Amino acid sequence: MKFSSVKVFLSLVFVCLFTFNLNGERGKSKRGKIKVACIGDSITFGARLEDPSADSYPAQLQKLLGKKYEVKNFGVGGCTLIRKGRPTVWNELSKIMEMNPDVVVISLGTNDTCGMGTCGNRKCWEYKDELESDYRDLVDTLQSLPSKPLIHICAPSPMVLETPGLDSARVEGLTVRKPRLQEIISIVKNLVQEKKVEFIDLNTPMDHKPELFTEKDGVHPNKEGYRAIAELVYQEISK
């Protein structure tokens, strides 16, 4: 009698363990890779690189994070945060939402400093009073995704006036735009607190480091600069 009871007990334990293991494996396959969406402008895309698909910051971030992650580059040259910009991140939102990412990294604002006599005929800074509300709406939209992603908002990488080869017109334009970028960073920091999202500072660690930027440009990083961005983002995501 006792022997039969032991057999029944052991059988039940085996079934429970088997079921637990099976469910665990199913959960793992359903979850799959951790999806990371990198949202931004030409700096996210990898402008000035010979091969953005290999050396952009999202591509280098993929290498740092490894096979458990799937990093997708949603960078668009000239992209703005404000809705009235052309092009604007709002036109890309459907693609981002279709991915339903687990992690979102947003680095926008550089092109929003254009306007009022800088960057040719572009009009962005004329709408600076709409920046905060548009950014808030963007975060709200992403937070509403089914995946409930962990959102990281970046202080955009700096404009480095010490970069070799800048002509006088470029220096003049960047001198006007650089303080505007700091205003945007202040908005970013306020939103981080308000929305309880994560903050990544790409500005302070890279400022006054011309060796990280493309010559005659001063805004777009070189290969080493994109590597620096990837490492800064990696440090935050992997915490």
Region roles according to the model:
Residues 32-37, 43-136, 182, 220:
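Conserved SGNH/GDSL esterase-like catalytic core that processes O-acyl groups on lipids
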